[in-house]
Amino acid sequence: MKKRIYAPATIANFGPGFDVFGMAIEEPGDEVIVKESDSFEIEVEGYDVPRDENNVAVISAKALFKMVGEEGGVKIRLKKGVRPKSGLGSSGASSVAGALAAARVLGVDNDELIIMAALEGEKAASGSPHGDNVIPSYYGGFNILESLNPLRVHRVDVELNVVVVLPEVEVPTKEARRIVPEKVPLKDAIKNLAMASSLVLALKEGDIETVGRLLDDNLALPYRKKLMPWFDEVRKAGLEAGAYGVTVSGSGPSLFAIGENLKDIGKAMKEKFEELGIRAEFWITKTGRGAKWY
């Protein structure tokens, strides 16, 4: 019997929470139709991603089979709705969908096993099994990753409206991770700790203006901006249009903003991209549910 799985896109880092904060959004997402098979097969619709066993959905599905010691496989039909190299957790969504596809076939309902399998797909895509896309895509909402081993995740109950602006440029995740130094100045680490702690409190209190003010980062963004030379100008356009805060989603190039008039903010940022010779699109979305099957 065929089973369907949907895994949403995500906003990782969420300002100062490098590799720790992540929020699912309502759209876009990846959908998988899966059925049991003697081997691992995949068909892909939508964005161009590997159509063989190098696809992260297959890697994650295989990982779960191996973890539980089962033979066999799955046939996956992936409707790829999250653009690769967009900063919206494309590989994370496919990895979650693939791991859940295997879980539905195998009858596995252990969250930690499914997440660990999905992280194998994320590792293959980005070079690092970071969980700030996989975990919010799986659980939904706003998540704080305390640790992966053992898996400890904290969730903040929040419904946040955001505008996402996606330019027609790519920032490969592996390159965006490589460019971040292993060590940063102590003052930058202290600043990020202060911003991250304050942002969580502001989210819990519903203080969206303060959340916006804290959408900044001293650990990764100063280095990643070298891959996004347009960032400062587009951010300024969003702030001038009334945004409380604007920053990068994940490793970029997508940006997100919060504020009162999200349509005006998105339009201003899109127009600034176009002034710089870069096509872009924007859409308004909000905190999303996690992966689901039906």
Swiss-Prot record:
SUPFAM superfamilies: GHMP Kinase, C-terminal domain, Ribosomal protein S5 domain 2-like. Signal peptide: none annotated. Its EC number is 2.7.1.39. It comes from Pyrococcus abyssi (strain GE5 / Orsay). ATP binds at R83, P84, K85, S86, G87, L88, G89, S90, S91, G92, A93. Keywords: Amino-acid biosynthesis, ATP-binding, Cytoplasm, Kinase, Nucleotide-binding, Threonine biosynthesis, Transferase. One of its GO terms (biological process) is threonine biosynthetic process. Catalyzes the ATP-dependent phosphorylation of L-homoserine to L-homoserine phosphate. It is found in: Cytoplasm. Belongs to the GHMP kinase family. Homoserine kinase subfamily. GO terms for cellular component: cytoplasm. Coiled coil: none annotated. This is Homoserine kinase.
